């Protein structure tokens, strides 16, 4: 089976048609093939992300937090399945995989409560005749390059904070 990309809520078959094997490190057995993206695929994904970011930037903070809590719940409900995938693909023990998920979930938990820090501030007369405003202004699309040896923890360190803010 070939594992393709997931873009904008659906499977995306990269134009490159190149793949690499996904091996179980304990047995050396090839379990799947992973599709590789090329520059044209990356350009497509960035364009789709930029379009999606426009709507996301206008999404109410409370709604983003609700989505983060739902994501948190899904991680909890499916942690054994995620751990099993880490064991199969990365060769970790089940306990190590669960620990990786737990460490990543700490950042998900933080992201669920980030709304208190994103409300903005106003300081009247911070200096003579100077008022200070702090505003949330979404910057745009971000990307994360994650190491193979922490396939759950590192993405959970990056993406929830980017999405919540």
Regions found by a protein language model. Name each.
Residues 1-130:
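N-terminal Rossmann-like NAD(P)+-binding subdomain of aldehyde/semialdehyde dehydrogenases
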